[in-house]
Amino acid sequence: LDMLHMAFSRLKEDKSPGLDGQSVGDYRENLEPNLQDLLQRIHRGSYRPQPCLRRDIPKENGKTRPLGLACVEDKIVQRTLVMILERIYEVDFYDNSYGYRPGKSCHQALGELGKVIATRRVDWISDAD
């Protein structure tokens, strides 16, 4: 239950609700019973993630990109799983791996890249997404 509380506390209030229409604020109104119920469903194996609400977000080039908006409970479960997996695998990651890591950022990655380019011969750079 503590991890579900931690996961909930990391959710952003201003994000759009998912398919169920429930906001983080709505979920907070009955937080303790909601988290207890969620935990019981996880333990029983009856928790099922909901479909994401699909929104098309306009891009600068005039096209759109699809965005899936998860409901609050799914975000809580996803965040809890991230916290568990980070504890397990963080020790195995390379120090120069910056993507989606706690305490690491794209700005730090760019700074490190700048140092490498300035101090070593670089024959190629790969740009990947």
Residues covered by each model-derived region:
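Conserved pre-catalytic core of RNA-dependent polymerases
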Residues: 1-128
